[in-house]
């Protein structure tokens, strides 16, 4: 179970309605907010409609494959950071290789133990959260560096003005 007042939102894309229902139920039982789509095109629309923390998608789907879905997510400036886990029924390594080549964060082969899939999803979500926090911290540090550089520039200008005033006063005292 996820210990958070706002559980992560998962988008599950699976053309087989029975498999989609089972996965949606299992992820919901694990504490996730689940949006289920049976078509990749409706999944893309859903991704643009509301922020999603992670996508779980079948590799082989009619119309738009899981590989193409991953590429669309990675090519979208708003969605590109969204983790994607692909599920493949292919028994050879080519499904995983193709998935990773397209930019998938993980590829899980069928049949799989659902508790392992949940653990993989939790792992990807934790990494995404860490990267997001790191980016936010870096942005805050960058802002502090800029602010401090401006403050130092202003202090330097004030010191230079004071130095010029001291030199002027020294010249006046030297003339007297």
Q: What residues fall within each predicted segment?
A:
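Short amphipathic alpha-helix used as the core "switch/output" element in two-component signaling
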Residues: 45, 67-80
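Active-site residues of response regulator receiver
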Residues: 58, 88
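Short hydrophobic/Thr-rich beta-strand motif most characteristic of the beta2 strand and flanking loop
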Residues: 31-39, 46
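C-terminal output/effector regions of signal-responsive regulators
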Residues: 135-176
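Acidic catalytic/metal-coordinating carboxylates
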Residues: 38-39, 65-68
């Amino acid at each position: 179970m996820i210990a958070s007042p706002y559980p992560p939102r998962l988008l599950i894309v699976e053309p087989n309605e029975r498999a989609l229902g089972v996965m949606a139920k299992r992820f919901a039982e694990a504490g996730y907010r689940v949006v289920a789509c049976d078509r990749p095109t409706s999944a893309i629309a859903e991704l643009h409609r509301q922020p999603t923390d992670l996508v779980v998608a079948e590799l082989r789907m009619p119309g738009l494959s899981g590989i193409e879905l991953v590429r669309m997510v990675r090519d979208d400036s708003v969605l590109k950071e969204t983790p994607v886990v692909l599920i493949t029924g292919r028994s050879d390594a080519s499904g995983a290789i193709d998935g990773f080549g397209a930019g998938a964060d993980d590829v899980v082969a069928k049949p799989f133990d659902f508790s392992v899939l949940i653990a993989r999803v939790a792992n990807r979500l934790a990494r995404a959260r860490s990267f997001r926090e790191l980016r936010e911290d870096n942005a805050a540090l960058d802002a502090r560096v800029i602010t401090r550089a401006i403050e130092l520039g202003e202090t330097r200008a004030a010191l230079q003005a004071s130095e010029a005033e001291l030199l002027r006063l020294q010249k006046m005292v030297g003339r007297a």
